[in-house]
Amino acid sequence: MEDVNQRVSELERMVNRLSGDLAENFFQTLQILSSIVGFTERFYDGSHAKYVSEKSAELARILGLGREDVFQIKVAALLHDIGKVGFYDSALYKYPNEMRPNEFAQYALHPEIGRQILKNHHGFDNISDIIYQHHEKIDGSGFPNGLKGNQIHPGAAIISVVNYYHNAVYKTKRERDEQSENKITNTQSYLNNTKEKFSSAMSFLQQKKGILFDRKVVEAFMAIAEMDRKKVSGKVVQRLPVNLIKPGMMFVENYYTSFGLLIASRGESVTKEMLGALVRFAENGEIPHKILVLVEADDVK
């Protein structure tokens, strides 16, 4: 009996080591893939992938999905456009209704390309299925398979809404380095500059809920988007040393390393996990020692 217990303990330790190795490999792969996705984001004000990932996860939690589902949706949202890597610029900055037939034909391939890239990597099988469906619409008018209603994965239905919103409000026909005139100087200028696009996007979601998009998902997301704008209105822009940056603050500019990797994107919320990395990048001269963030007006000294 003692030998059996010892063998069970050895097997448990081996499984734990294997699980740890698999988890480490998964996150290393995810880090590499998310960096690759950055090459598709030249025509966005801020990081499209990071925004869609953050808000899709928030939305999934609000809708009551379990922890594992939320995690898979967050990863799928981060990588949902990986199939666009290598696409012509016209497939990156144009909206689908602006594309020529040959441009749209290429664009429509990206969910399948994304699935093919990911499906054979350990831990990405369900994630690749969500990515494959993120352009499906509940009335069957989406692609690649014209799925309807409950045929669509809940995660894909969530990403579809957030993806539409961020494209509608933050996509631009100019590359990031040409967008200096859009830099946030104060919260009111940001709200004014995005007011028209925000109102148009919210109106479209309201009109198309229950038709193109899941009704519950749209209603929950619209509440999030409205609240986010209210939060911004109570903040001010301040340049702070990286060691004074706190979770919950919001980046006002995009920050890149010397080799072009996006470290923090405009509009992205600071998380606790970012703090150490920001300090290290600043110490190594990859980002400024002081960065622009939105802070609560009451916290300004």
Predicted regions and their residues:
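Boundary/linker elements of alpha-helical solenoid repeat scaffolds
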Residues: 14-17
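Metal-dependent catalytic cores of enzymes that make or break cyclic nucleotides
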Residues: 6, 10, 20, 27-247, ...
